[in-house]
């Protein structure tokens, strides 16, 4: 059985948490596509050519411990603006999406570019301030020293870059369900996503 769930949205909106929970609930495979770009960005920061880094990416590269840092996020946004890098990673993502047993992919262009035929498309968002608060709490728990104001500025700069890039800009697919998590608990947001998927599965059985 092939069933693809595409979950897009800006940084720290909750799409990763929702994606992991949804994948576990339905026993689908999960791919955080942002890690692909973070891994490429990390290699570029170390001196690698962006396209060569993307073409030579291995699953083992996604296990690096520094991929969740703010620096890796900014590097990811820069390399994601390169059409050649995005093209090099498309086949990897599409192959994962159509695997047997179902798949959940989260990123910024899954529903619009990678899997426009996905059975379910969600676009997860939240206010800038709430996203900055969440990211600050996440980083502070790991000993991060960035202030909430600095994180807010970084998020807004990354949003601007992601929305204005020519290659696969950040935007919801026309048929995506918009899920604003600003006022939602994690459980409430996950439940809304599960309900949307279960509804689509029921429609497919009719």
UniProtKB/Swiss-Prot annotation:
GO CC terms, sorted: cytoplasm
GO aspect biological process, one term: pyrimidine nucleotide metabolic process
Molecular function (Gene Ontology), one example: CMP kinase activity
Enzyme Commission numbers on file: 2.7.4.25
Reactions catalysed, as given in the entry: CMP + ATP = CDP + ADP; dCMP + ATP = dCDP + ADP
Localization (cell): Cytoplasm
Keyword list, A-Z: ATP-binding, Cytoplasm, Kinase, Nucleotide-binding, Transferase
Main location as per UniProt: cytoplasm
Residues the record lists as binding ATP: 9-17
InterPro entries: Cytidylate_kin (IPR003136), Cytidylate_kinase_dom (IPR011994), P-loop_NTPase (IPR027417)
Family designation: Belongs to the cytidylate kinase family. Type 1 subfamily.
Name of the protein in question: Cytidylate kinase
